[in-house]
């Protein structure tokens, strides 16, 4: 009998916003009490609600995660405490397939992502033109849009996998180009896991990469899927509702995340860690 593989190996806040694309055609498997199938009133909407930026207004549900008072966040029924030390790749597999991978599936999924990781020609030329005083989230939005223009295939699943695979290198290059460290950039090592490719591109002096990989991997797993109602996820859904591409939707979500009332929470969490 096959056992599901809780791998203890060593990807960015943007992943949690992919739920609006990855699961819009899937049945609800994860909502506590199957909330989405119930016909129930959640809010008495008044004219006052129209002028408060949707504060306190339920705007979405999530098919992949839910929260309980005792165990906190669950991904597809698994308490986050059971997943925190697993590899980001295995959690991405979980969010796609609603179950953890076997050892064989884990290996094959990693190979799949590795085959998609190379950035298209033209990305670095675009990054080289951006103002160094620009906010990194603005750089990220431009980078995601550029990826879509250069390598989008207009298939939500393929584009999602491609974006996941390309983000570590893109984000590492964004840091380097903003800081002016554009010489001696290490080649992208596709044999490394996703987080390892990011830290390899950063190539920071005096940093224990093994420790950094472990911290970033756990951090990313913890932030990978947090429900359907936060600002960036809502924004991504709104853009996607017009049948925009995955890249346009994710860029819009990152623009929403850039504001201090939303993204600052992630930054403060990382500073705490």
Predicted regions and their residues:
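Cationic, low-complexity basic patches in intrinsically disordered or flexible, solvent-exposed regions
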Residues: 8-9
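Hydrophobic alpha-helical bundle cores within soluble ligand-binding/oligomerization subdomains
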Residues: 14-26, 30-273
């Amino acid at each position: 009998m096959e056992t599901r593989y809780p791998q203890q190996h060593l990807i960015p806040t943007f992943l949690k916003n992919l739920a609006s694309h990855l699961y819009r055609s899937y049945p609800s498997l994860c909502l506590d009490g199957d909330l989405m199938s119930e016909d129930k009133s959640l809010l008495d909407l008044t004219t006052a609600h129209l002028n408060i930026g949707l504060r306190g207004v339920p705007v979405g549900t999530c098919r992949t995660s839910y929260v309980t008072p005792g165990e906190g966040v669950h991904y597809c029924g698994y308490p986050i405490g059971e997943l925190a030390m697993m590899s980001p790749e295995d959690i991405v597999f979980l969010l796609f397939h609603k179950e953890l991978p076997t050892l064989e599936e884990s290996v094959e999924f990693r190979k799949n992502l590795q085959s998609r990781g190379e950035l298209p020609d033209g990305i670095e030329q675009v990054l080289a033109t951006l103002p160094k005083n620009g906010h990194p989230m603005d750089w990220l939005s431009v980078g995601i849009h550029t990826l879509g223009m250069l390598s989008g295939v207009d298939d939500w699943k393929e584009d999602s996998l491609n974006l996941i695979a390309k983000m570590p290198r893109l984000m590492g290059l964004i840091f380097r180009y903003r800081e002016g460290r554009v010489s001696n950039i290490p080649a992208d090592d596709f044999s490394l896991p996703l987080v390892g490719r990011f830290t390899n591109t950063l190539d920071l002096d005096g940093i224990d990469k093994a420790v950094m990989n472990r911290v970033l991997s756990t951090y990313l797993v913890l932030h990978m899927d947090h429900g359907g109602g936060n600002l960036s996820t809502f924004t991504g859904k709104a853009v996607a509702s017009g049948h925009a591409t995955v890249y346009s939707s994710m860029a819009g979500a990152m623009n929403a995340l850039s504001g201090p009332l939303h993204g600052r929470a992630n930054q403060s969490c990382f500073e705490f860690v």
